[in-house]
Structures are given as structure tokens and as C-alpha cells.
Amino acid sequence: MFRTFINAWKITDLRKKLLFTALIILIYRIGSAMPVPFVDIASEGIFGEEAAGTFLTYLSMMTGNAFNYGTLFALSITPYINASIIIQLLAVAIPALQKLSKEGEEGRKKMNKITRYFALGLGFAQSIAYYFFIKSQNMLLTDANGKAFTGFYAVLQAIVVILCYTAGTALVMWLGEQINEKGIGNGISMILFAGIVARMPTTIANLYQYMDRGGAYFVLVPIAAIALVGMIFFIVWMDNGERKIPIQYAKRVVGRKMYGGQNTHMPIKVNMCGVLPVIFASSVLSILPTIAMFAPGEEGGFWNKLTTVWLGQTHPFYGTIYFIFIIFFAYFYAAIQYNPIEMADNLRKNSGSIPGIRPGKPTVSYITNILNRMTLIGALLLSVVAMFPIIYSQIAGLFTEYGMNLAVGGTSIIIMVGVALETEKQLESQMMMRHYKGFLD
């Protein structure tokens, strides 16, 4: 991987793309530390260790701690992710959107435009929720007497804070699009990657704090560290795994030349959806707790328990729903990315066939069965990686007084490793286009 980046750096065009991507990430990190008018940034964050394992920890992880400190990019890219999920689900249910999504490049641009506008609407709604949240945490500036603003100044304060967070959401979306157009990697993934990496020192510091407590932690922390490193190797292995469907092309005579006749294969990856199922599953599970910022409900009531206890990352209910959502989104995006009918039709048009399988419907059925099996295997492996830290946290709680929160560890590692591998592959393809040998050669 490092050799790939070194070789890419030697190419002027790729070096410019890498520098541009680094510049965008730097701007994002500056925005993540930039204060908002009327908001008093807490030196130790809005919530502390008592919030460990809750959805607040997840949002803080996804935003690189910006959510915890109430800075400009506190909402980060989460409104855009949620908007993408909703629009793509609606595209399956609404014929007009489904037709638009199949209209090629123009249709894709229109769908992206709809997603952006919807993301702004969600960003505005989440900004209102976040305003009430930081207000409940006494994070808003007060008058000279230490009292909250009233009347006109209270309204002005609310408008400024909400608009700033909405503008922050729009700016993060724009930064992601700039990476897509002029940089390297996927914009959304790179921003999430930057946020998670920025939070790594805090995660490492938390592990050291567990060690200071002594006792069983002297055994549990090293095991957790070794397991997390092992997860990295496992994710790399899973990402490189694929099923090769043999393809045989018939010979064709065009004029005086003969074409085809070669044998090749169609690769079907184990983890064909990458990190998307994990990102989207986590984002969907954060929607209800976000709504709870508006209406926390009665203390001890069903709604309050659902959003504060059951949807906490360390609760078995959360783990079960998380597992189901990962599998659902894995199948959902596999269905979007791969169309067995089109794949079989393309083979027929190019005089290709799968040995032992008749063209037409049998080929479609064969490809569909393989896709379903590979999707299931990939989804289960992805779920195991995502769930392992949650299960380990539960086991650690049996042997220690304070427990051990590693709930977001699996999600973080999957996103980081997945984004790094996707970026490496994109660099490899760029170098291959320029006839430059890279790591995979």
C-alpha cells in the first residue's frame, strides 16, 4: 500500500490529486475545530464517560469529535448519508425516481441534486435538534448576569446557531463533492475516514485509562488491542476474496480477422458493497436517538428507554438490529450494483457463455444464485467484524466493575480499512491508465 502511494506521488497528475485531497481534509478538520457564534465550546466536551456506548459516542466518532464540542461541522456528513439512504430506498418504491435513476449520466446528476436538497432539509432539521440538545447541556452563551437570553436575543441566538450548523452541513457536502471531482477516493468516505482518524488518539487514551484501573484490565486491554489488529488483517483478506465465474467466448470471423475464442472469468467479490452497509446501518440506527433530541419523552417511559438504553451500542437489542440492518443493506446495494439480467445479456451480445450453463434464463439464474450466496457470506463476515467489539464489551463487563466500551471499534476499523483499500485501488487504476507499475503488478 505504501509503495502504491510512493509511486503515485511520482506522477504529477496524481500528486496534484493527492495534495488537493489533503487540502480538503485539512479544511474539514479546521471546520471541525471552528466555534459557532453563541456556543460555548466545552474544554472537555459536552458529554463524558457516562455517555460511553450511547448513540452520542457514535455521532462523535463519525464527526471526529466535532459533535461532542459543538463546532461548525458538528453534524458533519451524517445528514447527507441519511438523505442518500432515504432517496435510494424511495427510488425502489416510486416509479418516477426509479425511471430517473436509469437515465444514465443525466439521471444520475438529477438524483444527486435531489439528494443534496433533501440532505439540506435533513441538515436543517438536525440543526434544530442539535440546538435544543446543546441548550439542554447549558452550552449556549448567557448575558452578563449569567442568565439565558430572552425575547428577541433568544430568537436571534437560535436562528444564528441553527443556520451555522446547516451551513456547516452544506459546506461538508461541497467538500465531499470536490474530492469526487478533483481528488482521490470517494468524498463521503474520505471525510468519514478523516473524522475517525482524528478521534484515534482519544480512543487510544481511553485504552490507557482502562489499564490504569488495574485488575482484569491488564489482560482484557492487550487482548482487545491484538483483536483489533487482527480485524484489520481479516478485513483486508475479506476485501480481496472473490469468486471467479469462468467465461468462454466463441470465435467470430469479421472480414479476414478472427475475434474471440479466449477463456476468461467474471469476478464476484465477497465484500462487493465495501463499507456502505456498515455506514448506512449505523446511520439508520442513529435516526431515532436524533429525534429524541427534540422529544426525549418521559423519564423511564418506552420512548425514553428505546432511544437512550436499547439503542445504546452496548445493548443486545442494538446489536441484533445492527446485525439485521447490515445484512439488509448488503443485499440492497448488491441488487443495485449487479443486475444478473444485464450481465447475462451482455455475455450473449459478446458471444460469451458460462461453460455448462445454457444462455438466457439458466445463465441469469446461475449468476443470481452466486450473487445471493456471495452477498450472504460477505454480509455475515462484515457483521461479525462489526459485532465483535460489542460482544467483547459485554464479556468484559462480566469480569470488571466498570466494563469496557469498544462498541464503535468495529465500525471505525471497517470504515478506515475499507476506505484505505478503495483509495489504493483507485490509485492503482489511475497508474494503470498511465502505464505505470504499481503494487498489484
What residue ranges belong to the model's regions?
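N-terminal cationic and glycine-rich segments that engage phosphates or anionic surfaces
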Residues: 1-101, 106-441
